[in-house]
Amino acid sequence: MMKKSATTSSACNGCPAHSGNKLRRMGTDAERYDFTIALAGNPNTGKSTVFNALTGLKQHTGNWPGKTVEKAEGAFSYAGSSYKIVDLPGTYSLLSTSEDEEIARDFILFGKPDVTLIVADATRLERNMNLILQILEITDRAVLCANLMDEAERNGVEIDLRGLSRRLGIPVVGASARSGEGISDLLSALSEVAQGIYRCTPHRLTSIGTEIDTRIDSLAESIRLFHPDTPNSRWLALRLTEGDRRVENILYADNEAPAEKLKKEVDEFRRNFGEDLHDQLSEALYSDAGKICQEVITQANKRGRTPLDIKIDRIVTSRKWGFPIMLLMLALVLWITIVGSNYPSQWLSDSLVGILHPLLKTRATGFLPDWLSGFLIDGVYLATAWVVSVMLPPMAIFFPLFTLLEDFGFLPRVAFNLDELFRRSGAHGKQALTMTMGFGCNAAAIINTRIIDSQRERLIAILTNNFSLCNGRWPTQILLATIFLTPAVPAYLRGVIGIGSVVAIALLGIAFMFFFSWVLSRTLLRGQVSTFNLELPPYRPPQFWQTIYKSIVDRTLVVLWRAVVFAAPAGALIWLTCNIQIGGVGIAEYLIDLLDGPGWLMGLNGVILLAYVLAIPANEIVIPTILMLTVLTTGIDGGTGAGVMFEADGTAETARLFEAGGWTMLTGINLMLFCLLHNPCSTTLFNIYKETGSRKWTLLAALIPLATGFVVTVAVAFVWRLVGG
């Protein structure tokens, strides 16, 4: 039970008026609503958990900063009124100009929500207070949810919520959103503020100085005079004095007298009180935050963390053990993924390719023309079936494991360990987080680069993320390591060599990411490395089954659907290139002959290069395409027709086909390298263009890894042939 000083519970909370049965979760049905709620707060405070508890949606939550990178909307109804709730990106401040901070600030300021629900971490309220006070400078209608009250109690933190409410001038509710405790009180507070029953008198900065405060009020009055429809003129006045470009663009939209008068007032303010008010404003915020927290927080554990957390971090983030543990965890996740996905992948392949494909062909005979049957069943269907059978089982294992590590709190420690390396390479420390996301899916990681404040450093993260070996490329690496590397060692070492070689490829990708971040930061994207706060969240036991469900639904199936959308037309294209002939020779054979020259230079062949061209929509269909093209060019037994992708019966049969195609150990090793170092898939390229809005940066993101792959494979092939004769 929570201590009385750390909860808002009262004797009446059990009555119907305060029970949660008035809540009706409406998911995304927000077309008609009476009130709008902005959901704001620091990263990793449980905002998304509160959002899910109110709306019934399943937005992904994780135990690390930066999970929400854009606005998510949901709806609920309570006590006869309907509400739209907008989950804003988590941010530590509203005073700078990163994308997530601008989204949050602009919605609270210009979106005019009826209530701003601020979610704070009760175990670290003093760290959250800075943002709370900034939000209260913007809006007059807010509710504070002190979340994670159960953890606060375990850590010996007691909060006088009534005293905090008096000091802030807004309702304050204690809650534990994961268990649903306090949600009914939160709903009641939101309803009262939205309907005007509770009149907020929000805290205003008191440590900024009387003279500055008077001048700010005078400038705010001028803004109200010239722009009467603009919300919160005081906050806009503060931002004008700091030179906020977006606010200047809004208020200086014309060059007429009002704009000139405002500019003169701002210039006079800066002459009297300095060019930069930022330091003084920050000092005032920290001063007020410190005074408030000192009054309302009693903390038995002054460090705010359990001794066990501290002991674990001394090992996990140490210089001696941090990297070995990180590599061990990566190897363990890979091993579980590899071993666990073998049988499900085989079962799906047997079902979708071995049973359903021939059945569809039989049913189509006499019903569809041969060319249409081949196009739809051998092309579109078979490519889609391959993507599902090869991609679904590893993702269904990898993503839940990845998410469990998120929820436990391990991934921020990985970012902490890698931060210094990224800083030295001229990149932002948060790139460590997007790099880790890239191991699951590069396309998703590109979107999550929004957590990086600096546009320059965000571009570096986008341009180099493809060096993270994504989930779609793991099966190819594993197959090649099994066929070409493990047979050269004793049987008892084969598992270690197989896993070790794949981990080595992944580490090589990280090394290239550091290298190109360093190059870009000193050439095309010069600039100073930004500083940032990386908060190490407490270790939390994951909600196991809920995490499994969410990771499969929100990640695995979403990524799989995107891959299928691109794989289906790719299958059609592959079938067409193999079956359309010119002068009695298929287009595919012409292209293979054309690519054999550069393929030989790279230690590969024309079949492999054409497979990568045709399989650009999805990395998962590279190996089936290679096998199909190998059968087409060699004329050996295998497959069921031109342009029909298939899988050999086991690695031994696959090895036989590779050998028939003229493959050597050099081919296998260089294909492992090229699998890492080639252009992003079409889904990732689409996301890059969407995030950058630039064809130039999208093209560069494709050329950097592709050119690197060409140079590396040519160099390896040259040395190999030189040494081997």
Swiss-Prot record:
GTP 2 binds at G66, K67, T68, V69, E70. Its main location: membrane. Disruption phenotype: A 3-fold increase in intracellular manganese levels. It comes from the Bacteria. It is a multi-pass membrane protein. Keywords: Cell inner membrane, Cell membrane, GTP-binding, Manganese, Membrane, Nucleotide-binding, Transmembrane, Transmembrane helix, Transport. InterPro entries: Fe2_transport_prot-B, Fe2_transport_prot_B_C, FeoB_Cyto, FeoB_GTPase, G_FEOB_dom, Gate_dom, GTP-bd, P-loop_NTPase. The chain crosses the membrane at residues 321-341, 385-405, 473-493, 496-516, 556-576, 628-648, 657-677, 699-719. GTP 3 binds at D87, L88, P89, G90. The keyword Cell inner membrane applies. It is found in: Cell inner membrane. Residues 34-196 form the FeoB-type G domain. One of its GO terms (molecular function) is ferrous iron transmembrane transporter activity. GTP 1 binds at G41, N42, P43, N44, T45, G46, K47, S48. GTP binds at N147, L148, M149, D150, S176, A177, R178. One of its GO terms (cellular component) is plasma membrane. It holds the Pfam family FeoB_N. Not involved in Fe(2+) uptake but is involved in manganese uptake. Could be GTP-driven. Belongs to the TRAFAC class TrmE-Era-EngA-EngB-Septin-like GTPase superfamily. FeoB GTPase (TC 9.A.8) family. This is Fe(2+) transporter FeoB homolog. The gene is feoB2.
